[in-house]
């Protein structure tokens, strides 16, 4: 079981060089991938930003959304994560706190490309940063 955040999924789905390292980590074991429902919105927002800056074409972004929909992800409701996420507010954004809370609840590693998240205090999640 692995929790994957939007930064890692976006790299994976866009098949970037960093995404290749994410893929190697995610698929080295036969693990299930778990995410909060928030991941879909965050990936789409990331794609929007990349399209606006010209880094990704609208057509490629549309394909990536289809790939996201097809990816076998176990999506979790925010309801069970909200209380713990709130306690993390001093050190982690509400968005990141959803992933951290889920990783803690499942006792699973959180795979991310967000380096600062790994050094944020106040949580017990095992965070694996892919660089």
Question: Where are each of the predicted segments found?
Answer:
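Acidic, PIN/NYN-like endoribonuclease modules and their adjacent C-terminal/linker elements
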Residues: 1, 100-131
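A general alpha-helix detector
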Residues: 42-46, 64-67, 84
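Short, well-structured N-terminal submotif of metal-dependent ribonuclease cores
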Residues: 1-38, 50-63, 122
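Short glycine/serine- and small hydrophobic-enriched flexible loop segments
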Residues: 45-52, 105
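Active-site neighborhoods of divalent-metal-dependent phosphate/nucleic-acid chemistry enzymes
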Residues: 71-113
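Alpha-helix capping/helix-boundary segments
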Residues: 9, 39, 81, 99, ...
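Phosphate- and divalent-cation-binding pockets in alpha/beta enzyme and binding domains
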Residues: 21, 42, 84, 119-120
